[in-house]
Amino acid sequence: MDIIKWLESWYKLNCDGDWEHSYGVKIETIDNPGWSVKIDLVNTLLENVHIEYSLIESTETDWYGYSIKNSAFNAAGDPTKLLFLIELFKSIVEEYDTVYVSKLLE
């Protein structure tokens, strides 16, 4: 469950007294069945990132999809994919964080 701690830290880092009043993290169940994860990215490092929707469907019961557009990470997956979807978001944050940090060092 370390990924939940990581998400808590990411959320806390972005709470600045204003951001959390309009933006945040939403985790819901969907009727496929499965999970939906929406994470607002306005005023964050990923605000201007765009990733086209990608659906990875191994079987009817083993699937997930995700995108980043309109300053939001949107992902959904089968009932076993909740932690995976959060890990996926973490990997995207870390990828762009590395790019951002390297640009700062130039």
What are these regions (language model features)?
Residues 1-16:
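Eukaryotic proteins' extreme N-terminal regulatory segments
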Residues 15-54:
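Amphipathic, interaction-prone secondary-structure segments
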Residues 12-16, 32, 90, 94, ...:
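Generic surface-pattern signal
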Residues 56-102:
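Helix-rich interaction surfaces within compact, conserved domain-sized segments
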Residues 105-106:
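Compositionally biased terminal segments
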Residues 2-6, 22, 34-36, 84:
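Short, well-structured alpha-helical interface segments that form or flank functional binding sites
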